[in-house]
Amino acid sequence: MAPAKKGGEKKKGRSAINEVVTREYTINIHKRIHGIGFKKRAPRALKEIRKFAVKEMRTPDVRIDTRLNKAVWAKGIRNVPYRIRVRLSRKRNEDEDSPNKLYTLVTYVPVTNYKGLQTVNVDEN
């Protein structure tokens, strides 16, 4: 049996969810829109990218860059790219009356080959 914890040993620290951070991910769109009808594929792909960003960054406010939108729609409504490389940036909301303190900006990262790419933290410059 695990040893019992004493009452006053709780870790006090800042939550990592409130940190401003930027990461690059490869999203497999193909598995997320498999079985979706032709006329709903590109719109569904954008919804899935938004859902992925909410899950990874834990902010309900997700903003998609126009270049990412153009990249998803580049081959039309039917032929969405199988994979896409995106940069998710969790940022502070400048708007004071907004209910969310943070938002996520999703930008497109053009790559020629997806082989061997992993999720990486990007330094804020």
Swiss-Prot record:
Q: Name one GO cellular component term.
A: cytosolic large ribosomal subunit
Q: What is the lineage of its organism?
A: Eukaryota, Metazoa, Chordata, Craniata, Vertebrata
Q: Report what the protein is called.
A: Large ribosomal subunit protein eL31
**Assembly description:** Component of the large ribosomal subunit.
Q: Primary place of residence? A: cytoplasm
Summary of the function given for this chain in its UniProt record: Component of the large ribosomal subunit. The ribosome is a large ribonucleoprotein complex responsible for the synthesis of proteins in the cell.
Q: Which organism is it from?
A: Xenopus laevis
Q: Which GO terms describe its molecular function?
A: structural constituent of ribosome
Provide the family line: Belongs to the eukaryotic ribosomal protein eL31 family.
